[in-house]
């Protein structure tokens, strides 16, 4: 549905006609993903929410009219279809107006596959630039800035979209390059779209924006779009490999230690690259990543073949190149005068469940090493902003905040500043090249170390992807957690932040963990994702759960049902004759408030034993069993309500297969006095912090009990709670001897 047409003029005198329409966002996104298997273009997709930082959105396009490509100092602005030819002349004139004083040399038109290109070279300046002006020295960004000025307008969506390679940093901060670069490596691929899909998932709005451009009597209206097609072709003969042998990455950590010891480096982020044969298409990999690894900066970018957009004729059969990513880290975002970054440093693996996650988060937040990592990153980031921001405006607005991803938990800082007069979004972009979280500190020394010690050139890794808006905005994410697909295979490069406290083998393991989610996306179909819910095995066992007005009884019943048993939960106070009349196989005494006598637990125990039925008690249930057999109860000086304790196993059968020490949750004030536990009962577990009886078993009868709550979230570590309940059902019902 059309929502209207508008017309405006850019800062360079180009007339833009805009037609907007409402579309089916999900259907259009799926269609675009499929098109990007063959057509050049970009899809940027945020599938991660964080209040005040990230929302869910998609923006993308295929078959753009213009591409801007660079390698070292050489730059090509190429028309990719007939519509792009209309824009080449104003591009040429904008660059010609800058001339050699801005470093633009060898400016010319060249023929190409579609309709030619404007080609130039940017020469390094032969004069000194003060540090405050370093971002204005001649570089590839001189051309990018000229294009932004040519198309400058208030439209919030029109801009240059694509990928920025790692080597662009050396135009800002030159160092000696020692690693070989492949001939096909490109440092920059940006596209100017004319047909944009924008989906705001939070607002529930999906729109298509179509642009026509007119200048000097020529217009794109009515001209054909489209572009060349390159199909991905897997190479089935390739084998998986890594640019480091096992232990090689750890050896690099040890080498870095020498630099830390001398004070040459404070931290450095070294990487290793894994290569895999890849039979799936880039579109399928993107869908897998989005499903398995939601992230604020997801992307699928078809960069075209290496020769495309460089004023050259494509070679028959030449492979394309794609970037598919799920980056967790904002690189630089600029809106108006506000500059934002979100440095990530400090990493720990996700737990097995939310409770385990909480323990991992505490471990991460309590790690002095991880705190030091992030502190150094943020100090360097603040320095990057101070070059181009208003004095006093650079502030940390979020400190060591937790962000959780599919397999990792990170600590993140949120830093902002306000641009000084005379600086723009590209100055902010350049002043941060590249983020300390992918290089190190001091930054120049770290990049020199990486050039000397990494095994292969980074190419796109550690650079950025995103959008340079013609309205002065900028939104970019770091090129991390990215799959590069080319030549029939897929590459995944991952790194870790090293500092003096780093343990070499642990850092190597961290890189392997980071890579695992993306290697899985290459290897494993979407439908193979595990649900994490274990199926119960049906059995013919019937369990009576006696409810002592407890608030956790239904969770306990749930655990019992997970063993496959049929569970009947019956409020205490029923006639005890029902115990023998209803064909139960196990009687379970629940927790509850008060004392055992308040619920007449003794008669229930007597009736169960008379019926020859095994008995299992939890919390109040343990207290009732101990009293029945002649033991005495005491009262804790400090109640243990909703508090965990470490439990040590002393013996018995009920706790077989559990760790010798484990964590469990307690909700009680009464306890069984250990010195008064009768000889007929064996104490099989105690709490480590206060030496309270935590489990008992009858020496001859199938009777057992625990003081802690196996059904509590505090008892989830290593699946201890459910394992205990399985033991109770499997071992008590047949009796100890048979179990």
Residue ranges and their predicted role:
Residues 517-600, 607-613, 726-739:
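N-terminal beta1-alpha1 cap of cysteine-dependent amidohydrolase-like domains
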